[in-house]
Amino acid sequence: MKRDDDSGQVLLLIVAYASIALLLVTVVVGASAVHVERKQLLAVADAAALDAADAVDTDVLYGTGARPGAVPLSDRSVQAAVEDYAVAVGATGRFQDFRVEGATGSPDGRTAQVTLSARARLPLVSAVLGEYAAGVPLTVTARARTNLG
């Protein structure tokens, strides 16, 4: 019985498929980590928006008075409430490059708009994801409004 000339080719195929599988695992783990970190950042933004929606701007309240059914907010009161909340929950230490963005404020004097940004860390960095070794930039926005009865 004569042996074929293509003996040993199966090993090459196994190595190629194993490499592809490892790269696929790296990409899936990285995408999952980014998704989870984005959801955590969005949860902080939601909670900060809820907290900021109750941050009454006393200058507006006592100066011009409140409109019926609305808590008077200002960019300054929302920004201060969000920064205080972020420090209180430890968001600055939990997220890499955490920032409260300039879009944070009150666009209409009634709604608290919170925009946060951070970088998601990738647990596995390979040749495929090497471009994101410093992390993936994330930006989230949440809005909340408090209505008075």
Regions found by a protein language model. Name each.
Residues D51, Q113-S117, T139-R145:
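Soluble periplasmic/extracytoplasmic beta-strand elements of cell-envelope proteins
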Residues D5-V10, F98-S106, V140-G149:
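Short secondary-structure transition/capping segments
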Residues M1-S77:
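Alpha-helical assembly-interface signal, strongest on the long, hydrophobic N-terminal helix that forms
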Residues L122-G149:
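Low-complexity, S/T/G/P-rich flexible repeat/linker segments used as non-globular hinges
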Residues L50, V87, R119-R121, N147:
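Residue-level marker of positions within ordered structural domains that often coincide
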Residues D51-T115:
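Short amphipathic secondary-structure patches
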